[in-house]
């Protein structure tokens, strides 16, 4: 959840072969995207995969990434936005995100969902009503059920 969700999302791009399933929530509405460019703007790591080979000395394995079942969730009232602060993103990244994905957490989350769906990423997106930047027992139970289901299909 939150910063650990952002870490998990990025780790899955770098090492998709090590992940059987993942669940992330409360991540500022900004997912790393399986795109080199959006609206003709280069999306470098940690926003996208434009410079992936240069950084990791391997190509991004989109097929392996697509094979990961992902449970991605946000609270509808979550407006916690690390994108707007220097400790999370630099000025160039912040401008790319705000201009191309949206400056509002919830709209950005919807845009990221569109991109994941267009790329056929194996993700289930859930938005929880009346929830901000926190978890509830309902959310925790859904995450548990998601992982139990993944264990049973393995």
Can you annotate each of these PLM segments?
Residues 26:
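N-terminal Rossmann-fold cofactor-binding loop
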Residues 1-2:
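Conserved alpha/beta-hydrolase "nucleophile elbow" surrounding the catalytic nucleophile
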Residues 21, 29-119:
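The feature captures the conserved acid-bearing segment of alpha/beta-hydrolase catalytic domains
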Residues 23, 71, 124-126:
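A structural signal for isolated positions on well-ordered beta-strands in alpha/beta enzyme cores
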Residues 6-8, 31-33, 80-82, 133-137:
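Short catalytic/ligand-binding loop motif for oxyanion handling, primarily in non-cytosolic enzymes
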């Amino acid at each position: 959840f939150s910063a650990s969700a952002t870490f998990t999302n990025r780790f899955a791009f770098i090492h998709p072969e090590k992940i059987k399933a993942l669940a992330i929530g409360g991540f500022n509405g900004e997912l790393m995207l399986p795109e080199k460019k959006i609206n003709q703007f280069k999306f470098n790591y940690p926003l996208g995969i434009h410079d992936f080979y240069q950084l990791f000395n391997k190509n991004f394995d989109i097929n392996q990434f697509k094979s990961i079942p992902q449970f991605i969730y946000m609270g509808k009232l979550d407006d916690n936005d690390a994108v707007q602060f220097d400790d999370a993103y630099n000025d160039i990244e912040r401008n790319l995100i705000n201009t191309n994905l949206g400056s509002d957490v919830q709209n950005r989350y919807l845009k990221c969902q569109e991109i994941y769906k267009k790329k056929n990423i194996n993700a289930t997106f859930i938005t929880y009503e009346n929830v901000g930047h926190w978890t509830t027992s309902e959310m925790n139970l859904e995450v548990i059920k998601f992982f139990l289901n993944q264990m049973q299909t393995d």
